[in-house]
Amino acid sequence: MNGKKEMKEINTGETYTSLVTGNFIDNSKSEIMTMSLTTTDTPANGKLVTIDSDNSVSSMSVDMDADVGKFVSCSLGMLSTKEVGVFVDGITSSNDYNTQVLFYNQKTKRLENPIYKKANRGRLSTQRSTTTTCEDIDNDGIMEIPVVKKLPVLENLRNSNVSYETSWCNYDNNGNSAKIKSTVIINDNYGYSINIPNEWINNYTAY
């Protein structure tokens, strides 16, 4: 009207805990990705919502970890130079953190959550006792996922605060696996972080 664009509200009928917009399907427009925690009525899920040119609404969904009671961050980021996803860091019922990655798989034409799908007896490979969250550690545009393990404890230092080894990983959709980009020691108690050379892996500890 008079050369001005009008904004129109479209009711998608979706309820959600968190929402991110992005170009997930490799087209010329953005879609909506919603993430929902478990409620008495619905299980935890992620949904990719699209709105067509005629304002019709369609969606596809994928299961998420029902043990997560709070989302810490839901970040739009690149899995690779061509794939966009949402990196979801959450807190579980045991106060651990974990990460799930939601993305539209161009080959299968489905919304996927591969880390949750490969969970071992309900435990995700990204579950950790530290509060580290996903980030692009080297500013190359591709997000890294923290995979954390506690370092071994020497017998005479059982009561000491042992550090955690954090492997920053990229998710490889082609191989359906995580690839380690770098490994660091993070000790929140003493406030330090150290890069670890490959030859040290499995041969050291730190406090």
Task: For the regions a language model picked out, list residue spans one by one.
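Beta-propeller-forming repeat regions
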Residues: 1-207
